[in-house]
Amino acid sequence: MSVTMRQMLEAGVHFGHQTRFWNPRMAPFIFGHRNKIHIVNLEKSLPMFQEAQKFVRQLSANKGNVLFVGTKRAARDIVREEAQRAGMPYVDQRWLGGMLTNFKTVKQSIKRLNDLEAQIAEPGRLSKKEILTVQREVDKLNRSLGGIREMGGLPDALFIIDVGYQKGAVVEAKKLGIPVIGVVDTNNSPEGVDYVIPGNDDSARAIRLYARGMADAALEGRAQVISEIVGGEEFVEVEEEEGGVAAE
């Protein structure tokens, strides 16, 4: 689904932060200010958003994984819902230090989570008291790792709501050479972000627009591959039928 400038306006993407909190590195993306609030230039935001979508679409078409990251209160539910819709991994609670740079340890924690769930599922293995204790640990691990437990390995890219709030994620991705798509408000720096989306990172409507747009792009990428495979099969079948008729 393509996003229009009108939709961005309606979602409040253009509302930046108070002028006194601005980051000078965002100057190229600022249109002006109104009532001491910076106004983001949507004529720049829209094509940059579309460029990020194009990247996600191509990545998804090549079976790539985009890790959706949004742990601030306004973003959590939206990021989780849209990532799940697109079949992508996500972090919606807390970014654990080393989540990427120490992925080996993270994989061990995911294995422990799977083992504990298997223990609970096995009838008669644990007492009621033990089940409660284990369940508490499962819940804790699920909060941190539930969204990435099926990821398997490092993601091919990160999509981040509020790069200032998720600075740790940006630093880790940069260290590993993983591309970052990031929503950057006027109070943050675009440094270290490969695909900058200049815009409001606090409004739930704006966050929904970004996350839905990236999820749609991921789904479109996968659908494109499926249609190519199906189309190819249909073409082969037609050729065979024509060959059969000619042979007669």
Curated annotation (Swiss-Prot):
Question: What are the UniProt keywords, alphabetically?
Answer: Ribonucleoprotein, Ribosomal protein
Key word Metal-binding present in the record?
Answer: no
Q: Which Gene3D superfamilies match?
A: Glucose-6-phosphate isomerase like protein, domain 1 (3.40.50.10490), Helix hairpin bin (1.10.287.610)
GO biological process: one example: translation
Instruction: Identify the GO cellular component terms for this protein.
Output: cytosolic small ribosomal subunit
Output one GO MF annotation.
structural constituent of ribosome
Family listed: Belongs to the universal ribosomal protein uS2 family.
Identification of the protein by name: Small ribosomal subunit protein uS2
Instruction: Identify the gene encoding this protein.
Output: rpsB
